[in-house]
C-alpha cells in the first residue's frame, strides 16, 4: 500500500478550470485502479497558508537548532513542519496547478517555500546543493491556455519549470509531466485539446 498525496493549487470551479478537471480525472482514475492505496487530498487554497516570512524562518531555524523561540515563532514553525512532514511521508505525490501570469498561483509558491528546508529536503555541501528526497514518484498536472512548449513563449514558462526545478533540487528523479495547453489560444480546437489531454491523464493515473 502506498501513501499518496494529492495537491491541488486552484480553487476555481471545475467547469471553469482545465487544471481542476485534470486533478479530478486523475484522482477518480487512480482511486479505481489503486483501491489499496491511502489517499490524502490537500487543497492549498482551502488551507489559507500564511506567507513564509521572517517569523517562520526564525522559528524553523531556532527550533531546528534547539534554540529558544517566541510563541509566534514556535507556532509558525509548527505550521510549516506539518506540511513538510506530510510531504516527506508520501510515497507518491500528485501536483495539479495552472499557469497564471506565466508562473504558479501564489499559494503554491508559499507551499514550496515551506518545503524548501535545509537538512530536510536538501543539504549544502562544498560541491553544491544535494537533494535528500529520494524514492518518491511525482506527477505534475498543468494547464495553460497558450502554447508554451515551443516558440517564443517557451522561455516565459515559469510554472512547470519552477516546480520541476525545486523537485529536482530536493532529489526527486521520478517525475511525470502531463500538460494541457493551447485551449485558449486555439478556441476552435479547445474541446478536442482538453478531451485528448484528459484521456492521457486518465491513462497515466491507472499506471501511476
Mark where each language-model region is:
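N-terminal beta1-alpha1-beta2 submodule of the flavodoxin-like/Rossmannoid cofactor-binding fold
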Residues: 1-97, 102-113, 117, 199-208
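A short helix->loop->beta-strand "cap" motif at the edges of active sites that frequently abuts
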Residues: 2, 35, 135-136, 172
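Cofactor-binding loop segments of dinucleotide-utilizing enzymes, especially the Rossmann-like FAD-
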Residues: 9, 143, 180
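Short histidine/acidic/glycine/proline-rich micro-motifs that form metal-
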Residues: 11-14, 146-147, 184-185
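Glycine-rich phosphate/pyrophosphate-binding loop and the adjoining helix
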Residues: 28, 150-208
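Amphipathic coiled-coil/heptad-repeat helices and related helical stalk/stem segments
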Residues: 79-80, 125, 159, 197
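Substrate-gripping "pore-loop 1 plus following alpha2 helix"
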Residues: 118-124
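Short, glycine-/small-residue-rich phosphate/pyrophosphate-handling segment
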Residues: 124-169
Amino acid at each position: 500500500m502506498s501513501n499518496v498525496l494529492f495537491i491541488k493549487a486552484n480553487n476555481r470551479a471545475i467547469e471553469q478550470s482545465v487544471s481542476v478537471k485534470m486533478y479530478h480525472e486523475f484522482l477518480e482514475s487512480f482511486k479505481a485502479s489503486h483501491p489499496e492505496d491511502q489517499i490524502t487530498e490537500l487543497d492549498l487554497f482551502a488551507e489559507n497558508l500564511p506567507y513564509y516570512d521572517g517569523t517562520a524562518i526564525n522559528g524553523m531555524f531556532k527550533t531546528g537548532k534547539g534554540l529558544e523561540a517566541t510563541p509566534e515563532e514556535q507556532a509558525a514553525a509548527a505550521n510549516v513542519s506539518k506540511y513538510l512532514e506530510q510531504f516527506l511521508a508520501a510515497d507518491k505525490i500528485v501536483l495539479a496547478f495552472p499557469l497564471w501570469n506565466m508562473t504558479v498561483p501564489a499559494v503554491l509558491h508559499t507551499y514550496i517555500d515551506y518545503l524548501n528546508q535545509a537538512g530536510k529536503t536538501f543539504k549544502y555541501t562544498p560541491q553544491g546543493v544535494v537533494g535528500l528526497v529520494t524514492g518518491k514518484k511525482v506527477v505534475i498536472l498543468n494547464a495553460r491556455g497558450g502554447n508554451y512548449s515551443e516558440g517564443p513563449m517557451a522561455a516565459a514558462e515559469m510554472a512547470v519549470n519552477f516546480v520541476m526545478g525545486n523537485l529536482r533540487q530536493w532529489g526527486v528523479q521520478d517525475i511525470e509531466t502531463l500538460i494541457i495547453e493551447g485551449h485558449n489560444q486555439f478556441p476552435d480546437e479547445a474541446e478536442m485539446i482538453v478531451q485528448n489531454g484528459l484521456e492521457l491523464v486518465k491513462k497515466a493515473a491507472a499506471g501511476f
